[in-house]
């Protein structure tokens, strides 16, 4: 199949899959807003960074290990099988602290994220349940990434969408007919990755399957090799958590719980937007890694250009939709009809989403750098985007401009990162893919 056709096949299927993942959090927020109003939206926004931290670990292990596997497979190196087994084992070990936190200190974790007494009391059942299921969130990321890299992106997409559909349907069933409230929302979210893993497991029964689970002890060396290439995925997910945490504390000081609830609306739609651009980067990754493994540097560069053009078009479509539907989108999560919350969220949506004109390119470029075994540049880009630039811009701009400065921090930080990323790409363009 032509490389361009392969690109759009992998990317489109991966976008749909990741959209499903983000939409189940969107569904959680919608149903929780109906049950608990702005306090419920505030609670979920305080929990979002915890989700991000769990997904960040899973993403780093999954994408890094799957990239190592894809490169080894392209070079006919049988040792690539060990990356799959090691990824599963390390993810289970990495999830243990989250499970312990869910079992014993969910309230302390919510207080650490900025929750007051009322929010903590409301959120303990929700946080406890989803933290206890942390291994399934991480392993779902891993199984999906490896199935995609083993030539079955369609099954990975179907599995992710099926898990997300289960979450949306059972959010409603558990919360309303069964009356389980926020605990029901957490239970539906927690079970959805199990559904996805079960469907992805069909790949192992196919004759085209080349993945095998090798009996071995967890290897710190293999994990370190994988994490070098997975750091962009880690920081990409973690950046959402860092951004949400910093913004939450700034907005609590500027506008209280109503400000955090308004940001909750923005953050939930931002998850959907980020999923679209992650879909482009992660969809292109197996193809870029294959080109790199076969020394097809021209093919790898072509995929970078295709990806960059795709994210720019998607950013324009996304912003047009957000700008035209701002009031409608905000109203979905404003069951109490709070005028102040609606005003904050309206301004926030229109300012914040300008940043995706730059964020899409940054996500694509970081994924490309990892896929062609340039972990240092990928790490620099990702850390600038996810840590340094966003924290600096949010602190400085909020101090000068108040709430508008908080909303402007995301576009400003993504612009600065895009300039750095362009420099890194051009600096070694003649020497590497």
Predicted regions: what they are:
Residues 62, 129-148, 156-167, 185-198, ...:
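Short runs within selected transmembrane alpha-helices of multi-pass transporters and secretion channels
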Residues 29, 102, 145, 171, ...:
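Structural signal for membrane-spanning alpha-helices in multi-pass inner-membrane proteins
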Residues 14-63, 67, 130-137, 224-290, ...:
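Transmembrane helix-bundle signature of multi-pass secondary active exporters and lipid flippases
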Residues 41-96, 100, 137-156, 262-326, ...:
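Small-residue-rich hydrophobic transmembrane alpha-helices
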Residues 29, 38-41, 153, 182, ...:
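Membrane-helix interface/capping residues of multi-pass secondary transporters
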Residues 26, 35-38, 72, 149-150, ...:
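Helix-loop interface residues and adjacent transmembrane-helix termini in multi-pass membrane transporters
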Residues 53-56, 167-171, 197-201, 271-275, ...:
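Hydrophobic transmembrane alpha-helices of multi-pass small-molecule transporters
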Residues 1-15, 69-135, 177-231, 288-355, ...:
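Short alpha-helical transmembrane segments in multi-pass integral membrane proteins
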């Amino acid at each position: 199949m032509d490389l361009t056709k392969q690109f759009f096949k992998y990317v489109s299927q991966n976008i749909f899959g990741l959209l499903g993942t983000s939409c189940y959090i969107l569904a959680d927020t919608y149903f929780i807003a109906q049950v608990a109003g702005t306090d419920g939206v505030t609670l979920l926004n305080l929990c979002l960074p915890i989700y991000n931290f769990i997904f960040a670990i899973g993403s780093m292990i999954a994408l890094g290990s799957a990239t190592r596997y894809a490169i080894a497979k392209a070079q006919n190196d049988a040792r690539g099988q060990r990356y799959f087994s090691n990824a599963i084992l390390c993810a289970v070990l990495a999830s243990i602290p989250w499970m312990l936190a869910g079992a014993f200190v969910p309230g302390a974790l919510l207080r650490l994220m900025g929750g007051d007494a009322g929010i903590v009391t409301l959120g303990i059942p929700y946080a406890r349940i989803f933290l206890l299921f942390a291994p399934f969130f991480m392993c779902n990321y891993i199984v999906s990434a490896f199935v995609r890299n083993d030539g079955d992106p369609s099954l990975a997409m179907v599995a992710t969408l099926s898990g997300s559909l289960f979450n949306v349907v059972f959010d409603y069933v558990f919360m309303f007919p069964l009356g389980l409230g926020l605990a029901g929302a957490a239970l539906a979210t927690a079970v959805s990755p199990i559904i996805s893993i079960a469907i992805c497991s069909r790949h192992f029964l196919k004759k085209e399957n080349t993945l095998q689970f090798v009996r071995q002890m967890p290897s710190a060396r293999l994990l370190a090799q994988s994490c070098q290439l997975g750091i962009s995925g880690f920081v990409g997910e973690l950046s959402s958590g860092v951004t949400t945490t910093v913004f939450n504390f700034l907005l609590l000081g500027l506008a209280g719980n109503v400000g955090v609830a308004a940001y909750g609306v923005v953050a939930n739609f931002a998850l959907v937007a980020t999923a679209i651009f992650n879909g482009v980067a992660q969809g292109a990754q197996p193809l870029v890694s294959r080109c790199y493994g076969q020394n097809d540097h021209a093919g790898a560069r072509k995929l970078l250009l295709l990806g960059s053009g795709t994210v720019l078009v998607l950013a324009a479509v996304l912003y047009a939709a957000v700008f035209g539907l701002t009031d409608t989108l905000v109203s979905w999560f404003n069951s109490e009809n709070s005028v102040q919350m609606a005003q904050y969220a309206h301004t926030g949506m229109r300012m914040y989403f300008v940043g995706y004109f730059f964020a899409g390119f940054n996500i694509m470029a970081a994924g490309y750098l990892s896929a062609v075994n340039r972990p240092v540049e990928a790490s620099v880009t990702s850390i600038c985007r996810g840590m340094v630039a966003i924290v600096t811009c949010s602190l400085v701009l909020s101090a000068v401009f108040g709430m508008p400065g908080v909303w402007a921090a995301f576009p400003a930080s993504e612009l600065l990162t895009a300039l750095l990323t362009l420099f890194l790409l051009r600096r070694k363009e003649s020497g590497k893919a």
